[in-house]
Amino acid sequence: MIKRALISVSDKTGIVEFASALASKGIEIISTGGTAKALSAAGLKVINISDITGFPECLDGRVKTLHPKVHAGLLAIRSNEEHMKQIKELGVETIDMVIINLYPFKQTILKGNVELEEAIENIDIGGPTMLRAAAKNYQDVAVIVDPADYKNVLNEMNESGDVSVKTKFRLAYKVFEHTSHYDTLIAKYLRDTLGDIDFPETLSLTYEKAQDMRYGENPHQKAVFYKEVGANTGLLPSAVQLHGKELSFNNINDTNGAIELVKEFDEPTVVAVKHTNPCGVGSADNIYDAYMRAYESDPVSIFGGIIAANREIDAKTAEEINKIFVEIVVAPSFTEDALAVLTQKKNVRLLKLENITDEISPDAYDMKKVAGGLLVQKYNSQLFNQEDLKCVTDVQPTKEQMEDLVFAMKVVKHTKSNAITLAKGKMTIGVGPGQTNRIVPTKVSIEYAGERSQGAVMASDAYFPFSDCVEAAAAAGIKAIIQPGGSIRDQESIDACNKYGIAMVFTGMRHFKH
């Protein structure tokens, strides 16, 4: 039976109503600081925590509840005769319910440009200590950390006169989930502030649920989408959905790939993605021409794909997009006329991502789950170092060819390895992704390109182990190649390029993607 409740909250949503309901059941209310003032102002009888401890709040409120009379009252096991004897001798009364939420550390650090001192002052000490104590003794203490639980707890109390052990256990779980999340945010903030710890000895990560899903990659798999706290605003979790049904697991995965690729480009660019691989990319002076280039790259594969643009979608572009079925269009904005066109189709999802061009931090973690472990690396934010670029052939690429080579390298960087991309006139004309050798994606991309390969350029995500890719490129009429270099047989590929009059540039930077 709940006789005494301790309330100390920073988020006062619904707390007066909840405390009033407790008081109406004859439950004694103990409180601290601002919470006590708010409850008293609402006409509730409140016992100040100082009256319980016999010790005043001090150090600007840093010490309020860190006292044996509080924690013994929380941790005493009611069925343990020795415990109950001890607290009686010590003059301690039990506390049966704790309602606490913590100092707003997350909200403080997310404001931007926060001073370290302010962040530190918003690290709660007494709150987590009481929460953990109450949760540890869940058999005897109901502990509430989430205002969303007020209603259910009251309903149960109204029906049965108490809170069941089953409910207390679930509430205790939420406490440890919450304090773990809270502490992880603090540790990450301090690590980021230090700035010299790339990979800590123990890695704690914390995310917040963004969306439940009907299923995962396949219908028999359960799934959910979590968002990173404080992530760059130019990433998918910050997108606003303007139209269409909720995004699926595969939608999110593919859209993320499209967003990451379109960030590589400064000029107006449209990216089309299927199964996380680009199937059409085009850059131009305006977004309409960029879309047409992306579409014409591969009019077959773009069907049912994801489209990402780094400029506002206008009505003219929307009309072209509407001629085919696409799953998603993500862009920094849409004109009203464009929305009127695109929303004619109920199955297309429209996402507005205002800061889609924002770069991803080079310090961001790129993680891959493996069975029993986690691979963590820094995000692949570089394309190449300008000083490492070198033409290794007799023939030098023209200015236009060099622009296309850089364009193609941006695309192949975001294509599953082993990958080859062909480009001409700032549009892809053939993409060969995800093969177990290098000659097959070369042939695949050439087959996609057809006659368009004449005069085109080629990009490879890794070095050529043999000269066979150059031979195939020459036969297709390709005039320039860009690749990392680094093979023990580089000279064979260089000799083949010289034989056929092909320019070849080494970047010195590999871009495997798995």
From Swiss-Prot:
Bilayer-crossing regions: none
Domain of life from the UniProt record: Bacteria
Family matches, as InterPro entries: AICAR_Tfase_dup_dom_sf, Cytidine_deaminase-like, MGS-like_dom, MGS-like_dom_sf, PurH-like
Keyword presence, Hydrolase: yes
EC numbers for this chain: 2.1.2.3, 3.5.4.10
Protein keywords: Hydrolase, Multifunctional enzyme, Purine biosynthesis, Transferase
Positions of the MGS-like domain: 1-145
Name of a matching Pfam family: MGS
PROSITE patterns the UniProt entry points to: MGS
Family from the record: Belongs to the PurH family.
NCBIfam families recorded: PRK00881.1, purH
HAMAP family, A to Z: PurH
Identification of the protein by name: Bifunctional purine biosynthesis protein PurH
Organism per entry: Ruminiclostridium cellulolyticum (strain ATCC 35319 / DSM 5812 / JCM 6584 / H10)
Gene from which this protein is expressed: purH
